[in-house]
Amino acid sequence: MLQPKRTKFRKVHKGRNRGIAAGTEVSFGTFGLKAVGRGRLTARQIEAARRAMTRAVKRQGKIWIRVFPDKPITEKPLEVRMGKGKGNVEYWVALIQPGKVMYEMDGVSEEVARHAFALAAAKLPIKTTFVTKTVM
């Protein structure tokens, strides 16, 4: 599972997922999976999508993961009264804004890439689209 090796603070405020995305262009591979909606991806969802893509391309080509879960999400145990401090860190998420390229792929044909990204998109909670690298 993806998570930071060390952080400055163990727990963070909830905050809001606003703003515009960085990393909106396909930069490493030839094909990409771009977010259309806004949301957050857990480390488990990122890994599930990666596994689906890897199986679909039969370990050919190369896959880049352009998102990293760096925000800790806390939860209180079941049947615990409110108060008594913030809960324990349960999982890590990556905040996604519209336009962010989340995955990239190279070394496979476009049909294979489209199929692999379709399988990966089914594992993700946000709407996505298939993009290709624009050559200047």
From Swiss-Prot:
GO BP field: translation
Keyword Ribonucleoprotein applies: yes
Signal peptide: none
GO CC entries: cytosolic large ribosomal subunit
Sample GO molecular function, one term: structural constituent of ribosome
Matches recorded under Gene3D superfamilies: Ribosomal protein L10e/L16
Pfam families tied to this protein: Ribosomal_L16
Keywords, in A-Z order: Ribonucleoprotein, Ribosomal protein, RNA-binding, rRNA-binding, tRNA-binding
Transmembrane portions of the chain: none
Keyword Transmembrane found: no
Entries under InterPro entries matching the protein: Ribosomal_uL16, Ribosomal_uL16_bact-type, Ribosomal_uL16_CS, Ribosomal_uL16_dom, Ribosomal_uL16_sf
NCBIfam families (UniProt xref): rplP_bact
Oligomeric and partner information: Part of the 50S ribosomal subunit.
Family classification: Belongs to the universal ribosomal protein uL16 family.
Function: Binds 23S rRNA and is also seen to make contacts with the A and possibly P site tRNAs.
PANTHER family: 50S/60S RIBOSOMAL PROTEIN L16, LARGE RIBOSOMAL SUBUNIT PROTEIN UL16M
Database matches in HAMAP family: Ribosomal_uL16 (MF_01342)
UniProt-recorded name of the protein: Large ribosomal subunit protein uL16
Lineage: Bacteria, Pseudomonadati, Pseudomonadota, Gammaproteobacteria, Pasteurellales
Underlying gene: rplP
